[in-house]
Amino acid sequence: MTKTIAINAGSSSLKWQLYLMPEEKVLAKGLIERIGLKDSISTVKFDGRSEQQILDIENHIQAVKILLDDLIRFDIIKAYDEITGVGHRVVAGGEYFKESTVVEGDVLEKVEELSLLAPLHNPANAAGVRAFKELLPDITSVVVFDTSFHTSMPEKAYRYPLPTKYYTENKVRKYGAHGTSHQFVAGEAAKLLGRPLEDLKLITCHIGNGGSITAVKAGKSVDTSMGFTPLGGIMMGTRTGDIDPAIIPYLMQYTEDFNTPEDISRVLNRESGLLGVSANSSDMRDIEAAVAEGNHEASLAYEMYVDRIQKHIGQYLAVLNGADAIVFTAGVGENAESFRRDVISGISWFGCDVDDEKNVFGVTGDISTEAAKIRVLVIPTDEELVIARDVERLKK
């Protein structure tokens, strides 16, 4: 038995989960927030307890030190060296990383080079790797990429209709994201349906504040909604998803909001989506509450959100030539029952239908009616478990 920790490092946060492997038992999990700011918050959950402390954490190295010391303080481990492996979520692996990889040689430098593809994520992911490398230099460190699952896409799906030189010289293509989540729920869907994954055609919908939809055939991604960056695809909490690219030069010419690349990125990534249209919130719970109060902008935002998701599901039904199941996962997908009902009711012509009694808050499993030809499943994602499994597989 070994202890492996899965890490998801953000620019000012560090989410973690400690496993006993190969039993896949969660020993503890936690979140450190507001790294680099005053009044940082460290939360540790274990044995039904939740312990929280507020302190000033300057950087990721200090955050990791506090995490490890908390594990000892709460008697979850006796010493640092009980942890024999650490796995790090990394958003962008580009074309270079086609699978999870042990951190050695120039791997970390390559991760940082790929920050061009995920400027909001990869630098923070790399900071988490460096912090653990400094404090636990002898354990196996593994990087697990959101993009790896999508490297099976055919060229017709991942290429953009731009001049070829922008692909060959600049690597402009679709990379996708959330691959670890899509991979996990596809495997769980096969178990739930009692059929081999290799025999299934699935549409997996990872719908949280960020969202993506993937067409999965025989356990492999054949197309996905996110593109060159996690900005593409469906409408999201604060991101536009797909828009006409000509909008950008138009707004550069006629407004003061698009003067620099940073301005463009800020508006499209942080000020749009549900938040931008509703002028209210990026949180689906707030949107639904505002809809119930008759707020027009919130209602429009919700309708647009559902519409874009329905269109992508329909698109992937065409890509797959039908599907065995549509899978909902992540924060909104797992918990917003009215959202699931509304998405499926608009595409019921394809043979999918939701049973209202099964489609209740917090339910997992098959929520379809008996007569539905395409099953509708709700499966909680577990990206941390996939990361821990990959660490065990790659340990020296």
From Swiss-Prot:
Tell me which InterPro entries the record gives: Ac/propionate_kinase, Aliphatic_acid_kin_short-chain, Aliphatic_acid_kinase_CS, ATPase_NBD
Q: What is its EC number?
A: 2.7.2.1
Record: residues binding substrate: R89
- Keywords of the record: ATP-binding, Cytoplasm, Kinase, Magnesium, Metal-binding, Nucleotide-binding, Transferase
Query: What's one Pfam family the UniProt record gives for this protein?
Result: Acetate_kinase
Q: Which Gene3D superfamilies match?
A: 3.30.420.40
**Residues given in the record as Mg(2+) binding sites:** N8, E383
Q: Where does ATP bind?
A: K15, H206, I207, G208, N209, G210, D283, M284, R285, G331, V332, G333, E334, N335
Cellular localisation:
Cytoplasm
- Pathway noted in the entry: Metabolic intermediate biosynthesis; acetyl-CoA biosynthesis; acetyl-CoA from acetate: step 1/2
Q: What class of enzyme is it?
A: transferase
- Which reaction does this chain catalyze? acetate + ATP = acetyl phosphate + ADP
- Quaternary structure note: Homodimer.
What does this gene product do? Answer: Catalyzes the formation of acetyl phosphate from acetate and ATP. Can also catalyze the reverse reaction.
| UniProt family annotation | Belongs to the acetokinase family.
Q: What is this protein called?
A: Acetate kinase
The coding gene here is ackA
